[in-house]
Amino acid sequence: MSAIENFDAHTPMMQQYLKLKAQHPEILLFYRMGDFYELFYDDAKRASQLLDISLTKRGASAGEPIPMAGIPYHAVENYLAKLVNQGESVAICEQIGDPATSKGPVERKVVRIVTPGTISDEALLQERQDNLLAAIWQDSKGFGYATLDISSGRFRLSEPADRETMAAELQRSNPAELLYAEDFAEMSLIEGRRGLRRRPLWEFEIDTARQQLNLQFGTRDLVGFGVENAPRGLCAAGCLLQYAKDTQRTTLPHIRSITMEREQDSIIMDAATRRNLEITQNLAGGAENTLASVLDCTVTPMGSRMLKRWLHMPVRDTRVLLERQQTIGALQDFTAELQPVLRQVGDLERILARLALRTARPRDLARMRHAFQQLPELRAQLETVDSAPVQALREKMGEFAELRDLLERAIIDTPPVLVRDGGVIASGYNEELDEWRALADGATDYLERLEVRERERTGLDTLKVGFNAVHGYYIQISRGQSHLAPINYMRRQTLKNAERYIIPELKEYEDKVLTSKGKALALEKQLYEELFDLLLPHLEALQQSASALAELDVLVNLAERAYTLNYTCPTFIDKPGIRITEGRHPVVEQVLNEPFIANPLNLSPQRRMLIITGPNMGGKSTYMRQTALIALMAYIGSYVPAQKVEIGPIDRIFTRVGAADDLASGRSTFMVEMTETANILHNATEYSLVLMDEIGRGTSTYDGLSLAWACAENLANKIKALTLFATHYFELTQLPEKMEGVANVHLDALEHGDTIAFMHSVQDGAASKSYGLAVAALAGVPKEVIKRARQKLRELESISPNAAATQVDGTQMSLLSVPEETSPAVEALENLDPDSLTPRQALEWIYRLKSLV
């Protein structure tokens, strides 16, 4: 029998718990009891496993022992962080009634729900990463996708047209929590993600969504946000907003707009491309040796998060890019002065979100005050920068002198963590608070005077006056002198070596002091809440200021990186093409212990495809990736690692570089490779940058070469994308002779005996050999195996000396001339014994052979 079914048999307190738990059946309930949050039944069992805490039992209710686990209330943030990191959600239930006046159990209420996508507490968030709540919706026309960063108020929606685009969006945004409809069809897209939340269909209803959003923004329609004609995106956004309100249990004033993200506004990169380019995460899942690790020397967490958003969404609007370039150029002489001041601003963006949610702690307000104190110096430094965009940022960041003055008067220099600890509001801010504090603080002087007086009166030299939280004020006398205690001393507590007493005068003073402390704390909490009321009317301007400060941090950082790492400003041109002089890989050049060999690149409508050959470890993949990374950096407005760069319009970047078996989906390396290749061939355009590395490796030589040839042909002749095509099939070096717009380049190496030296320098023309055996020897393959391989190589070369030669009949190569399969009719004839056939059987065979031809 379940606890709910046997409800009346439980104690009143457990009945209260079960009612609250029934409202939140799928998540853990932290039920406040004194100094602990308790969990019962299945919640206790789950929590003990997830948090590695003891599972105990609490007496019995309805005749059964109740499984129980508990955590101290003062350490709750640490436990919440562990649960959130595991994708769990928690309902926090607090005591809101007064135990002294309560009849029966103290009144309790769920005051907030902590979920992976709706956290705003500093202790639970990764400070340099966005933490997104997302919702996904699907109908016959495509997908709707919405994301909300509750720690900043940034609200976005999009309408991915197909599965590949939706997968790329999920990879880019990487939500901490994802809401989906109960009838969502493409479960394979989202399976395996943490923080999945199944929601009822009605939460995605379009009319409800419009109503919710208009109510949130105080508008009559959504035309002004540019999302009116995005029904799928709005369905997702409506569900997401409702969920955020339900979990926060408060208004969300910092969410004041919603933005549509359109494919045509940014360079599209699919999930494979983001992974292969190692933008913010390397192939092993870490953050080391990524593009972000090189570019991100921002000095504020909000600046770091903005830079990563830029890296994952390169913009195509050249006006925005030229403005960023101009700003970076103007700031290069000011980075040393600006960065130390910007560092002091801190994470104003997330502090403002906690202010809006009314969960900001005293130290948040102290940090906000410290940020305001930096603004006059920042504005003074920026005043001399000759740049219109910089001056626009300067105006947007504001000064907030009144708010700075308010917080300087209201909050002490170093406040405690929590307002309930008291001592947050500064002396002199409120006269009544100062009076109550004076009364409470006067206790020390009074107790000292009382102790001296009573010692003199009683003649007891061991007498002393003290206080503890359990018994309050007391007079303590040692056990040896306790028999001499005056008659008006009433025993309060007996210790091993002493007795503690109370006298009417001390009891009266205790009541007075405790009353004054309680009143001081209650007034302090009230004044603290009133500070929110004084700050929140300025929320919109404060959010604009935080955004401007984050952008300034990013641009100052990019200016510093450009100067320190010797980057150059790229030039944007109107026609498709990329021309790079002395290009370098931004990450590899930082980790090498030797000088990086810079290389040129020239792609244009007349030279659309480069067939890249050369040895393994020769630098082909590095050369290809550096081209994509230089293009990506140019399209966030950054300077780039090269001597000179001219770059035309790019709509998408595709990479087919390396692969591993996708065991979870049951796909082989070759299947993964072909899936990515199919995506490229379906979606690339003449404005796309395509990197193709070693297509066709996972199958037979003939199949692989055939596929590689056909893919290259399609990209060069039909799609006409800007393509870097690395291959070990030397037969493909014949392509430039057969198609216009295709050229050969190679990376060379020098062999000397058993050693090989890689030149890492890109040269025109095809490579002369692949150096595969030399690389194998370098890798430590046994000498006898290498020796045998050389013998076999000579045999094969003597058998087919012209394997790569072109045949007379047009574009077909000899290696592609796969022997025809034997006809079934021929096989049948070969197996036939004519001497054993009767005339009738012979006639039947003639008809059978006829059917096989």
Swiss-Prot record:
Disulfide bonds: none annotated. ATP binds at G614, P615, N616, M617, G618, G619, K620, S621. The keyword Cytoplasm does not apply. CDD domains: ABC_MutS1. One of its GO terms (cellular component) is cytosol. Keywords: ATP-binding, DNA damage, DNA repair, DNA-binding, Nucleotide-binding. GO terms for molecular function: ATP binding; ATP-dependent DNA damage sensor activity; damaged DNA binding; mismatched DNA binding. This protein is involved in the repair of mismatches in DNA. It is possible that it carries out the mismatch recognition step. This protein has a weak ATPase activity. This is DNA mismatch repair protein MutS. It comes from Shigella flexneri.
